[in-house]
């Protein structure tokens, strides 16, 4: 076997690429770097490789401009709470699941901050109130019932509900100024909401990982093929873009955290569990303003309610973002379509993913999701005037001259067979693994980055079953993520968990509210 030894500008040491390593991580985004950070703590002697096809880490979905930066905790995202017509109730199961998963991320980041692994939490996470805002009596009734149901759980204590326009205007003056006085509105206000710069977290974690002599990251290295080798190792074929040659690495474990490209790479591995899976690529655009007079009037992430039968991605929101210590406002998203599976991918990505196993599921999912097809068509034909009119519902006094359009990231939604063997479109994220778990990938989209630690813990259990329950890993995991041992919903009512939540937020310099707030503020 011919060796290829060279020094990459992002590496601290020379390394023999045609060799055996403990784990290969594909993609240098928030997911791979989070898993790599856990493994460096749990198994510091393990040799870890990250391969990234671009010339810089965190430039796809983790890039600060390619996502909305919402710390998804189900405070304001109405699509995480469904109305049940049968018994006139609100199902908060998914909201609780998302919130508890986000708590794990906060605990991990607090551990990293406390131990000096990452610095200055204000550089990557800040309190920005999360607000749900609706109009129309039906939506107001829904929001009120949602608030009352969420208040039965202490994870949502601190939230305030109001139908008083004056109170709401004090929270979001930009949204309320110039609005029709006869329009009935309602809002919930959660001061514990956050804005997160996932690119900054990724960059800081990588800087720490590079200090480990057993860790190497190779930029401009495109993983093109994965196959089983001697029933023991995975053979990874990597295209060295800069030197225009292919090298091979043999590894015991593989995690594919390559965003939209994860599906294509899983298909090359020829594992049974990916049969029938397909991807539906959807891009996003946002209107942006830097105008300080406008930005100063808005200090919140305001989420509305999607129209009936519309997909979750259609939920409009106007957000404060803090990027490089500078505030900007974003409004959107506006959907785009491209056959690329990555923002910097190939137009052939979608076509390369098609095969005899997933063509039928794709067609079936398309037939069953006509509202999505209609939504995308309407989005694609939108003019800038149409987009400004959409923004006007959340900023009545908008001036189009203050806003410009940016292209955000590319997401690939999951299409797979259900228990009736029919193709369905699935929103969210999912781990797909080989039979023994040694090869695993993350498919899907939101709320991925916000719950990256919860996903990582699931990966540890799937990929390293022989180590996950041993005493050494247990001890370390409890130190890293204190609620790991028993992260059940009921446990969050305990004094122990309340103290963990309080300590976590103190370390991250975030607001913590323990007291329940059942007060409803109505229009006088």
From Swiss-Prot:
Pfam family, one: Mqo
Any GO BP: tricarboxylic acid cycle
Broad EC category: oxidoreductase
Keyword line: FAD, Flavoprotein, Oxidoreductase, Tricarboxylic acid cycle
Pathway the protein takes part in: Carbohydrate metabolism; tricarboxylic acid cycle; oxaloacetate from (S)-malate (quinone route): step 1/1
Record EC number: 1.1.5.4
Catalytic activity as recorded in UniProt: (S)-malate + a quinone = a quinol + oxaloacetate
Domain of life of the organism encoding this protein: Bacteria
Molecular function GO terms recorded: 2-hydroxyglutarate dehydrogenase activity; L-malate dehydrogenase (quinone) activity
Cofactor annotation: FAD
Family matches, as HAMAP family: MQO
Family note: Belongs to the MQO family.
UniProt-recorded name of the protein: Probable malate:quinone oxidoreductase
Protein's organism: Blochmanniella floridana
Gene: mqo
